[in-house]
């Protein structure tokens, strides 16, 4: 196993020789051997074919025309538009008139589509409200009621009410929702918790997994599998009994482990990788290898600069979106270049910790129901995963978890994702103590903990801090008895959010926390979003634990 330095400089381990031809990369040559291991996916299950179509599938060259000309500043706008008539009629009309000299694309789109509303655009916060009051008053603003499905819209109707993050995000998101739920529970909104619990269970029943979000263009991927954590929250807060979700947890597990039994050593299929010693670990994946509908132009431009087959780049970009860390140096071979993305080649520490939690939850609930064989099976699966993680993803020299590049058979970067094993109880006490020292020296700032120590311009890197990472770090270290570090992160984060709130009277998606006064976080493919679901949820929960900052 080849170990990189824990804190490499950009001129050393974090960069690659971009002059090397793609064809000469010995790792990438293995792709030829994996064609049968990673076949083209079948049609997406769970919806009638007509409703599973994404806007790119429906509108073909019209979609590409709109996106390639940047008709809207945000690439997500057009995929979220709803057609005013049958999409086939729209496409036929477009083909008839597009070559006319006086053809106006903007007018055509406005005549044939309803544009999405800007969420919460009319909401003005009361500057006299405390941070707690502000969050509690935002829940109704961010709540969307169930509605009839608009024919041919990309929005997937849900049976119950749900919370959206805010800003450009007008749909519910899988892993965001867990951290939002923490705050809903603290605010006493058990009604919304029940609705969201039913929605996620419904999606598993109908789609076989929880999609990235409730849009057709999100059906081909999921997000970090946190449903087991949601079920635990439902049980703790008396919202729903955990036993009713055992079948749903098993279905989600089957989605993530699909194809595992057929894999030979060093082979992968969808989300599963069989390691050289026969153990099974997981990676992020998307069943499509085309530009994302919601970031179509950005993906096309990224692929142009990669030197790789575009479909491979698109797959890795999509898998990066499935990770929730879109994007980060974690997925890049060259830290300053998004075109070097290789998400599917990495075994992520956080994903495998979440799946350990899923396996453990299935075992625990099976025990409650007296299903002893299932309990024993999943206890063994969790034990096997922990052993594999310790073998491949634990850096004993530096005392931290790191992602693993399974193609190159070497450890990858250190990041705040390393705290997830503590959050789910997968680490031992020695690992937790050693990791605490690394987090203190590498990621901790007066504003919280940063996503990584590498400044790349990507939003899930230095200098940004994100609410879910703070929560998992706080609770993870406290779980292993390090109350001092957990409390320090909590107070630092509350101070960051409150300082920004006192000046701007809003909560935002991410914060710049590396030195100086906390301010808006930057980087990424879209402007900073306010609202913001998971920031509200984590901060509201922390206020319940620590009081108003």
Curated annotation (Swiss-Prot):
GO terms for biological process: cellular hyperosmotic response; trehalose catabolic process. Hydrolyzes trehalose to glucose. Could be involved, in cells returning to low osmolarity conditions, in the utilization of the accumulated cytoplasmic trehalose, which was synthesized in response to high osmolarity. One of its GO terms (molecular function) is alpha,alpha-trehalase activity. Belongs to the glycosyl hydrolase 37 family. GO terms for cellular component: cytoplasm. Pathway: Glycan degradation; trehalose degradation; D-glucose from alpha,alpha-trehalose: step 1/1. Keywords: Cytoplasm, Glycosidase, Hydrolase. It is found in: Cytoplasm. It comes from Salmonella typhimurium (strain LT2 / SGSC1412 / ATCC 700720). SUPFAM superfamilies: Six-hairpin glycosidases. This is Cytoplasmic trehalase. Monomer. Its EC number is 3.2.1.28. Substrate binds at residues 168, 175-176, 212, 221-223, 292-294, 324, 525. HAMAP family: Cyt_trehalase. NCBIfam families: PRK13270.1, PRK13271.1.
């Amino acid at each position: 196993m080849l170990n990189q330095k824990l804190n490499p400089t950009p001129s050393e381990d974090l960069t690659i020789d971009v002059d090397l031809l793609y064809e000469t990369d010995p790792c990438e040559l293995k792709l030829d051997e994996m064609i049968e291991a990673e076949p083209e996916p079948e049609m997406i299950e769970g919806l009638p074919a007509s409703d599973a179509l994404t806007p790119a599938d429906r509108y073909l060259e019209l979609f590409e025309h709109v996106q390639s000309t940047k008709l809207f500043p945000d690439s997500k706008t057009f995929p979220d538009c709803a057609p005013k008539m049958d999409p086939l009629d729209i496409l036929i009309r477009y083909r008839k008139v597009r070559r006319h000299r006086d053809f106006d694309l903007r007018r055509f789109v406005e005549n044939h589509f309803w544009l999405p509303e800007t969420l919460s655009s009319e909401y003005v916060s009361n500057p006299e409200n405390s941070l707690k009051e502000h969050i509690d008053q935002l829940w109704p603003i961010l709540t969307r009621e169930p509605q009839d499905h608009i024919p041919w819209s990309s929005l997937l109707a849900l049976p119950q009410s749900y919370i959206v993050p805010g800003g450009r995000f007008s749909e519910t998101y899988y892993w965001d929702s867990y951290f939002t739920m923490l705050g809903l529970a603290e605010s006493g909104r058990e009604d919304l918790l029940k609705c969201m619990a039913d929605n996620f269970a419904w999606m598993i029943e109908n789609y076989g997994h929880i999609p990235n979000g409730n849009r057709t263009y999100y059906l081909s991927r999921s997000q970090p599998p946190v449903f087991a954590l949601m079920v635990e929250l439902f049980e703790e807060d008396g919202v729903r009994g955990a036993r009713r979700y055992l079948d749903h947890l098993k279905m989600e597990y089957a989605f993530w482990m699909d194809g595992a039994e057929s894999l030979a050593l060093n082979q992968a299929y969808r989300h599963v990788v069989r390691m050289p010693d026969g153990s099974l670990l997981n990676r992020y994946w998307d069943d499509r290898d085309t530009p994302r509908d919601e970031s179509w132009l950005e993906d096309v431009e990224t692929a142009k600069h990669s030197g790789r087959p575009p479909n491979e780049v698109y797959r890795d970009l999509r898998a990066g979106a499935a990770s929730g860390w879109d994007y980060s140096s974690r997925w890049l071979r060259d830290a300053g270049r998004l075109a070097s993305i290789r998400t599917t080649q990495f075994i992520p520490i956080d994903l495998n910790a979440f799946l350990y939690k899923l396996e453990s939850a299935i075992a625990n609930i099976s025990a409650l129901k007296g299903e002893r064989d299932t309990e024993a099976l999943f206890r063994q699966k969790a034990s096997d995963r922990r052993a594999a993680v310790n073998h491949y993803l634990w850096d004993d020299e530096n005392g931290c978890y790191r992602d693993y590049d399974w193609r190159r058979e070497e450890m990858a970067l250190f990041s705040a994702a390393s705290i997830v094993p503590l959050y789910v109880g997968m680490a031992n006490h020695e690992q937790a103590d050693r990791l605490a020292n690394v987090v203190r020296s590498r990621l901790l700032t007066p504003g919280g903990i940063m996503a990584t120590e590498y400044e790349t311009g990507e939003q899930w890197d230095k200098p940004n801090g994100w609410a879910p990472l703070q929560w998992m770090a706080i609770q993870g270290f406290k779980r292993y008895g390090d109350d001092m570090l957990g409390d320090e992160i909590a107070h630092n984060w509350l101070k960051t959010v409150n300082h920004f709130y006192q000046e701007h009277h809003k909560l935002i998606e991410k914060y710049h926390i590396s030195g100086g006064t906390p301010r808006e976080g930057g980087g990424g493919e879209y402007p900073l979003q306010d609202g913001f679901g998971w920031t509200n949820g984590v901060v509201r929960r922390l206020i319940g634990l620590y009081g108003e900052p």
